[in-house]
From Swiss-Prot:
Cross-referenced Gene3D superfamilies: Photosystem II protein D1-like
Protein name, per record: Photosystem II D2 protein
Binding site for Fe cation: 215, 269
Subcellular location: Plastid, Chloroplast thylakoid membrane
Amino acid sequence: MTIALGKFTKDEKDLFDIMDDWLRRDRFVFVGWSGLLLFPCAYFAVGGWFTGTTFVTSWYTHGLASSYLEGCNFLTAAVSTPANSLAHSLLLLWGPEAQGDFTRWCQLGGLWTFVALHGAFGLIGFMLRQFELARSVQLRPYNAIAFSGPIAVFVSVFLIYPLGQSGWFFAPSFGVAAIFRFILFFQGFHNWTLNPFHMMGVAGVLGAALLCAIHGATVENTLFEDGDGANTFRAFNPTQAEETYSMVTANRFWSQIFGVAFSNKRWLHFFMLFVPVTGLWMSALGVVGLALNLRAYDFVSQEIRAAEDPEFETFYTKNILLNEGIRAWMAAQDQPHENLIFPEEVLPRGNAL
């Protein structure tokens, strides 16, 4: 018996190999296997948003005008959430609510679930695209890991939070002014700005912006080989092949400024990755907590003292009153189906009033 040792090679390519060759071919815009998820989902999400903001009203779900057709502009148009009565229905076009009627589907808010779900899978497809390309060119997958931060925020805010509440109605609608309304809602009903997870998110995002500005300025400041132009801007060449800045000079500069400085590029760039991604993940965790109506930082002793002593008031107690005002004024308008009526005497007023 003869045993042949060696690598097995197929004589003919099967369908998988043919698809793999075509999908991963070197072209101007890489497609890849991830593109099978990314491109259709991104196309439908963006297309659904443009369709909704252009033509579709929110009269039947929120009692609002929300399209260019009704007179909104770019800042006030939105694809709004379904009515609260529809709870967590996927609102499929062929489902029991719309029954295949496209106009009725739009009126019920079906475009919101369409955009939200295709948007989520589109973002996941983009992260998989970064994994796939990193694998192809033998890079580590830190870009994809970093992009998990925005995905975590999107999924927690647009999907997990409303799943914890009574329906998609309480998710943000897809529009600029609609997001502002949602932020006010979060503050009034959850005191979100005093939540430690929100604080970590703000520190991460603003800290990352600061690090980015400092890093870019420092690299530009420490270039030691450049063009021969008469001024900085003519001498600067963005297509320079190799890096010609001095890490040693940058280290000395910041050591003199702060007393401490990054000693190598790896630690510096890891820190620039760690700060924003951790901030985004922490804020996403905080929103998951809000989905379960968890409370954070209720300083009850100050509230009791403020209620008993007309001369005692803190910024915290003033903010609590503002939150009560947001709830009282917003709930009646934002949830008309609840028929909430607040008489004047129960509306909150601070000690100064």
